[in-house]
Amino acid sequence: MKEEKRGSRFLLIISVFIIFYIILSSSFYFGFINAYIVAGALFLTLMISWIFLFRYRHTKGKFGKVSLIVLLVGILFIFDFFLLQFEQMKYRTLIHEEPVQAAGNSGIHLMSVGTAYFSHAESKEWLIKNFERGGQDFFQIEEVDNKTRYHSRNDVFLQLVGIRNDEVSVMAKNVRSYLGEETAGVEQFLESEDISGDSAGLGLALTGLIEQNKLMNNLDFGVTGALSEQGEVSGIGMIKEKLMIAEKERYPFMIIPSENAQEARQVKEAESLEIQLFAVSHIDEAVRLINRLNAEAEV
């Protein structure tokens, strides 16, 4: 009877803590509290748990149950401790990044949008003035809320424990698998530390084909799109910003994923862009397109 009562009490304590944690996490997610309060509350709970663990260190049954509670609280404390690194982020800015060619004058320009976080900016208007004063092009400035911090923490944690591979690693694996062999320009690009996301996959694979002398190109193309190992092209984010960059660079052509075609056409019409858009769902379509446009240019 006593064992059943102790077991019920243990389950009650666990249930109360889980409810407490759900309320704590929800309060953070919806912006009622900050990461310091979350970490502080869990740290205090962990210290109290350690006190009970020390108290019952010679009581076999209770020691085991309290140890489980300490372990649970400790894991959640470590998990939520990652929130602190995002707490200082106040604003996120999407900025214009110069397109790059991974290999010489391949004509394949890899499109990317820079992301910068600011922790000490006085206000959104202050940031805008400083960007304009410095002549830096930017697309938008948005305030970082707790929902963004929460999801960013989850992504970082999953990558650290190996549950989710980061997009750059997946892109590198897919490009290398598709090409079948390493090429100097592609490898140099993949080894750089300032790349993020997987939207350069299609452009890198096309660059690799040029380096392998399997594709000839004398035109300028803005290229964006994720790539699978089999050469399928999938959608990417920030298509509007990438189109605006390509237009500013005066590229005549832009190759985009078919999944982004509708949005891209809407952006082109709304912004009165002159660039010609070509949507592809497989890299083979991009290769045929490049061959055709080069042949037409020679006539």
How should these model regions be labeled?
Residues 2-299:
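Peripheral, non-AAA+ core regions of ATP-driven protein-machinery
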